[in-house]
Design a protein with these regions (language model features):
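Predominantly transmembrane beta-strands of Gram-negative outer membrane beta-barrel pores used
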Residues: 15-17, 24-50, 60-68, 75-77, ...
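Surface-exposed loop/interface segments of Gram-negative outer-membrane beta-barrel transport/assembly proteins
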Residues: 1-7, 49-54, 60-150, 168-266
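A conditional alpha-helix N-cap/helix-loop micro-motif detector
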Residues: 18-19, 148
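Alpha-helical support elements that line or immediately flank enzyme active sites
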Residues: 153-156
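Outer-membrane beta-barrel channels and translocator barrels
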Residues: 22, 33-34, 68-72, 160-162, ...
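A short, hydrophobic C-terminal helix/tail in secreted or cell-surface proteins
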Residues: 267-271
Length: 271
């Protein structure tokens, strides 16, 4: 019947972009004199994926300062990086490999159909089989994205206290945080046989670390003999905080906040 209707749908082209254009911009500058130097850079890049709706936005920058004042030298470099990745609402490309060209994803009014095809057959009784439309899930409210932020600061100082006696110190500071959000509408075909429809999975990570390194050294030459003394102090700390939640049951497709749910639960292996 479907073949006679004359449908010839190129399913593999539906979730794929015809043309993807990305761009990248960078600005750099430096200057100063013998006692003071500076440099900074800013960047922004946008990359679009092969699947419709997928993209990666990345921006950030850094600044470097360096001072040379007689017997005192110190420098500092600070940088920030932000990345946001958005996955395609069309799901996995492999899902479209199993659709025959005579399956029409649209009804007579041009609306996306929820069910592509259903039929009944006899197997120790009457059994029905239904094939759902992956494109239907693509047009529903959804969210599948990751964001991350990274801040890094490196500070170093070098001081010649007296001839032969030198102090060096370094401080490294790093702050990282990330967030992942995956929301599926209660109308998604995944929840047809489930009591609690709609789901939201959210995970957050917050990492903090620092590293302090201090070196005090003394060197002196006495004719054929040398005196070399050193003191090293190192302090490190790393903190990790990761949280994951999975909630189900959303009364409205446009209510996509984790607090608007009926139940906190754990995802099944297939989720």
């Amino acid at each position: 019947k479907l073949v006679k209707e004359g449908n010839d749908v190129d399913w593999l082209s539906i979730p794929v972009r015809e043309l993807g254009v990305g761009h990248k911009h960078t600005v750099m500058a430096e200057g100063g004199n013998e006692s003071f130097r500076y440099a900074f850079d800013l960047f922004y890049s946008n990359k679009v994926g092969v699947m419709k709706g997928s993209k990666r936005d990345n921006y950030g920058g850094g600044i470097r300062l360096q001072y040379n004042l007689k017997n005192l030298k110190f420098s500092n470099y600070a940088s920030f990086d932000h990345l946001k990745s958005v996955n395609s609402p069309y799901g996995s490309f492999s899902s479209y490999l199993y659709y025959n060209p005579y399956y029409n994803p649209y009804d007579e009014n041009g609306n996306v159909k929820k069910v592509l095809y259903s039929y009944e057959y006899y197997d120790r009784g009457i059994t029905s089989k239904t094939m759902y439309n992956e494109l239907y899930n693509a047009v529903l409210p959804s969210k599948n994205q990751q964001t991350s932020n990274n801040f890094l600061n490196n500070f170093s100082i070098e001081y010649d206290i007296i001839q032969g006696l030198k102090l060096k110190a370094n401080l490294s500071l790093s702050v990282d945080n990330g967030k992942t959000d995956v929301y599926k509408s209660y109308e998604n075909t995944e929840f047809l046989d489930k009591e609690k429809k709609g789901s939201y999975a959210q995970s957050t990570s917050n990492d903090f670390s620092y590293d302090i390194n201090v070196i005090l050294s003394y060197f002196k030459s006495l004719k054929k003999h040398f005196i070399n003394l050193g003191f090293v102090y190192n302090l490190q700390e790393k903190q990790y905080d990761n949280t994951s939640i999975y909630v189900v049951g959303f009364p409205n497709a446009n209510m996509d906040h984790v607090s608007i749910c009926l139940l906190y639960t754990s995802p099944s292996p297939r989720d």
